[in-house]
Amino acid sequence: MQHEKSLEFLQIAMKYLPEAKEQLEKSGIELSMEAIQPFMNLFTTVMAEAYELGKSDAKSETE
């Protein structure tokens, strides 16, 4: 289950990657896949925690 969610989170990140890359390049920062990898790992960790928080909140609202 967690692996499936991580893949979903990565798909979301990849959806917005071109926009992020454009904004960074406007600021003079080049973005490569090697440079982005640690941030993608951080993103999936944050998204997993946010997902669990939302899941917990939804569960407590239905009780």
Swiss-Prot record:
Source organism: Bacillus subtilis (strain 168)
InterPro entries for the chain: ComZ
Coiled coil: none
The keyword Transcription is annotated on this UniProt entry: yes
Keyword tags: Competence, Repressor, Transcription, Transcription regulation
Gene designation per UniProt: comZ
Function: Negatively regulates the transcription of the comG operon.
Name of the protein described by the UniProt record: ComG operon repressor
Gene Ontology annotations of biological process type: establishment of competence for transformation
Pfam family, one: ComZ
Keyword Transcription attributed: yes
